[in-house]
């Protein structure tokens, strides 16, 4: 199982938000490419980049940093935030992204995944599903949909999504542990790999995810606040 450090960018800084709230940050650091390098030096085999400005404003803002990290990190990079069109996704793949993460737009219009998979291949498409109280939420967690994660997950898998990034919003950024059940349901019901995110605070949390068969776990706040040592975490889940 992969342990994938998050490098979330806002206003050209590396940040970690509490419950996705742009006004509530518990980490704010300069020079995202340097941070990315630090995680790779500690053993990260993949990086998770998020353009938070893009996610909140609907357009990509941190391309310069993203391109620098792709060029200099030496590991595959998955990228999300502000990817609202096929053109955006193709652009990032051409720049060297291993996977592009599509969120809201895929849930609202699953057909876009079919079209995109024909252009760039399923293996490059990761769909981001965020769930709150058992239902998928979109538009920066502001809007609730009628779908459960498994319902929309099956539709997106059929359309050509290559993997799912699943965030249980109820535990995201709060640093109080994980609820494994919603992720387990996805792993049990879908064929494509599931990458989990949200609420990991201990190596024990990571081992629980490993046990249910996720492909990887994105870690953010816990490594920035030194609750988890990345090297130890990678070693523990090998």
From Swiss-Prot:
EC category: isomerase
Any one GO cellular component localisation term in the record: cytoplasm
Major localization class: cytoplasm
One biological process term in Gene Ontology: L-tryptophan biosynthetic process
Annotated active site: 8, 130
Molecular function (Gene Ontology), one example: 1-(5-phosphoribosyl)-5-[(5-phosphoribosylamino)methylideneamino]imidazole-4-carboxamide isomerase activity
Enzyme Commission (EC) number: 5.3.1.16
Pfam families in the cross-refs: His_biosynth
InterPro entries assigned to the protein according to its UniProt record, in alphabetical order: Aldolase_TIM, His_biosynth, HisA_bact_arch, Isoase_HisA-like, Isoase_HisA-like_bact, RibuloseP-bd_barrel
Name the UniProt record assigns to this protein: 1-(5-phosphoribosyl)-5-[(5-phosphoribosylamino)methylideneamino] imidazole-4-carboxamide isomerase
Organism taxonomic ancestry: Archaea, Methanobacteriati, Methanobacteriota, Methanomada group, Methanococci
